[in-house]
């Protein structure tokens, strides 16, 4: 036997256990999370509730996690993908945000919900919009499923290109 066979060629390192803060930061790097959502994900990954809350508090204090920033991004993202204010408000509620944070995020949106509804109808039914009653119903159903209010639905389905 030669000496070369006795030398280990590569040592395997055991992966180091991540701290709760590191795990939370790993989640935040991928996308924004609300405090409640981040805490829930950490506890689902086997981290104790107190440690998860402490990690989230530390990251919030450092500026890595911010419920207001999360809410504003979510409102903008959902509005740009064709969802209305009712849907967006409900989704923000499912992420554990309080009514004040939801109201602030909705107020920060600079777009026009009625124009978003019109754009969605234009994309689905062409530039001329829904032509007959059946198409108007389909357009209204689409907008209602997407979370637009009645006024926006009426204005979008009776679309006038000169408007």
Swiss-Prot record:
InterPro entries: RecX_HTH_1st (IPR053926), RecX_HTH_2nd (IPR053924), RecX_HTH_3rd (IPR053925), Regulatory_RecX (IPR003783), WH-like_DNA-bd_sf (IPR036388). Keywords: Cytoplasm. GO terms for cellular component: cytoplasm. Residues 1-21 are annotated as: Disordered. It comes from the Bacteria. One of its GO terms (biological process) is regulation of DNA repair. Coiled coil: none annotated. It is found in: Cytoplasm. Pfam families: RecX_HTH1, RecX_HTH2, RecX_HTH3. Signal peptide: none annotated. Its main location: cytoplasm. HAMAP family: RecX (MF_01114). Modulates RecA activity. Belongs to the RecX family. This is Regulatory protein RecX. It comes from Stenotrophomonas maltophilia (strain R551-3).
